[in-house]
Amino acid sequence: MAKKKSPGTLAENRKARHDYNIEDTIEAGIVLQGTEIKSIRRGSANLKDSYAQVKNGEMYLNNMHIAPYEEGNRFNHDPLRSRKLLLHKREIFKLGEQTREIGYSIVPLKLYLKHGHCKVLLGVARGKKKYDKRQALKEKAVKRDVARDMKARY
């Protein structure tokens, strides 16, 4: 059974935790248009296959799909446009340095509201190999079996 989202969580990238080893996380604000935030609050955002990258000293989130707002008529947004992330220069520089190493990328893990503002939890990640994924699934199954046995004892 899937975990329930916390009240502020609007979208989660569960596939990222399966495909990547997350080494570091950082919170960033995101620049949105009016119809985008309305659509996000309805739960119409998808973080799958999205990534962040540094362009000209600024951080952008690419491939995040936000469905068009139904009541948005002609003022609706482009669902897959690049969205600017709000970070300090030193944070952008640090993330840029980490991603210059081969095999590292920045993936969004969660989209949530904090004090009425939309935030993105970014993770500096290294891709897992197929055997790493299998090993992680085996460890998860063992933990589940142990927990089930402990529960049955008491």
Curated annotation (Swiss-Prot):
Coiled coil: none annotated. It comes from the Bacteria. Its main location: cytoplasm. GO terms for cellular component: cytosol. GO terms for molecular function: RNA binding. GO terms for biological process: trans-translation. Keywords: Cytoplasm, RNA-binding. It holds the Pfam family SmpB. It is found in: Cytoplasm. Required for rescue of stalled ribosomes mediated by trans-translation. Binds to transfer-messenger RNA (tmRNA), required for stable association of tmRNA with ribosomes. tmRNA and SmpB together mimic tRNA shape, replacing the anticodon stem-loop with SmpB. tmRNA is encoded by the ssrA gene; the 2 termini fold to resemble tRNA(Ala) and it encodes a 'tag peptide', a short internal open reading frame. During trans-translation Ala-aminoacylated tmRNA acts like a tRNA, entering the A-site of stalled ribosomes, displacing the stalled mRNA. HAMAP family: SmpB. NCBIfam families: PRK05422.1, smpB. Belongs to the SmpB family. This is SsrA-binding protein.
